[in-house]
Amino acid sequence: MRKAGRPVWGGLGARIVKAPRALALLLATVIAATPLTFAQPAAAAVFPDDPADPVRAAEYWLDSLGVRAAWQTTRGAGQTIAIIDTGIGSGPPEFQGAVAGGTDVSGIGSSDGRTPVGVVDSNHGSWVASLAAARGTANGTGMVGVAPEAELLSVSLGFGSSATVPFVEQVANAIRWSVDHGATIINLSFTTNTLAWDPLWDSAFEYAFDNDVVVVVAAGNRGSGTTRVGAPATIPGVLTVAGVDPQGNASVQASTQGYTIGVSAPSENLLGVSADGRIVQWSGTSGAAPIVAGIAALVRSAHPDLDVANVINRLIETARPAAGTDPLLYGAGIVDAAGAITATVPTVTENPMGSLSEWIRVYRRADAGPVPDQTVAPVEIDALPPADAATPARSALLPSRESLIYGTLP
């Protein structure tokens, strides 16, 4: 049985934020006016957009990243985003008609993946999903995701002693299930806070890449006890997303740094739809990743001929300069939805985020093939003295998920 440390949600833990009073009052009014029962909205082929709606007005990234401009071309129709997280709530109207399927890989959730798993972080999957592809409510109001015409898959994960399946196996199973059920983009808003990953993930991520699925991963948060990216954000071929504040500066609390960062997206003052329908404000690269996953869905919808390498390359090549220039913090820059769809970008033959197959060939030497026959006699040396006893390693996950607290507006 494989064992692994508990993950840190992705934002790797959304952190408590103190909302400006005006925004808090505005959202409190919206939340108070939200009914406790959820009606099935009428099906519609077109999603109206009212920028004056208080919730839509608070979604600043729709304009700053060129998402509304991109909607003139596509809203993500024909694409499926798998949210591998704590599960997407089944009640909120923003998700009605958006979730095409789901499953649980933890052994403690529901078979459809729609029952939120976890006590402290059970809303996390719903927050993430709402940024990627929430469909709003009626008449262009309510929270809308970046790709509101894309479909979602809800795959619920569990942790530690509560789950009946080791976390490493859960992730591998979740990726394979998502690929087999039509995902074109997979979003992973969690980290293990370690650079290395279990070999079981090698074949799972290769399976996604071999089946032309874009995998978007949150870089992680400084506030969760780490300053550098950790797996799965270190796996070659994934698109790792760092976080910036509304002004385009690297987020001090909500983004780590590392060579594997591809692009940046907003990670502060984000909104999310909770599993019970409440709208909350939160921060973390857990939110930056699904914004980029949604934009990847827009690109794939507008350019259905592009493979994974060229979707990721288009996002990287059209990224706008950030407030700073350090690629360890920003990657190629801040993702630009409109540019990624309309710009002329030469095609590539290799994924700019690297090749997992090549990494495995070089670094998983145990699987590199048989050892060549000896050509000379080996040299014998004296045996080495006994080694000292190993010192137990400290936990790579700081803090543990139990110490992370999610915040809502007063």
Where are these predicted regions, by residue range?
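Subtilisin-like serine protease catalytic core
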Residues: W71-I81, I88-G101, T115-F167, T256-T260, ...
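Loop/turn elements at helix/coil->beta-strand transitions in domains of secreted/extracellular proteins
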Residues: A77-T80, E149-E151, D180-I186, D210-V215, ...
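Extracellular S/T/G-rich loop segment that most often corresponds to the catalytic His/Ser-adjacent loop
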Residues: G230-S301
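Substrate-binding/access-modulating region of protease and related hydrolase catalytic domains
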Residues: L157-A231, R278-V280
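Active-site glycine-centered loops adjacent to acidic/histidine catalytic or metal-binding residues
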Residues: D85, G220, G284
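Sec-dependent N-terminal signal peptides
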Residues: G11, R15-A33, Y406
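Protease zymogen maturation seam
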Residues: R2, L25-L26, A33-G78, P93-E94
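C-terminal subdomain of the subtilisin-like protease fold in secreted/lumenal serine endopeptidases
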Residues: N187, P304-T408
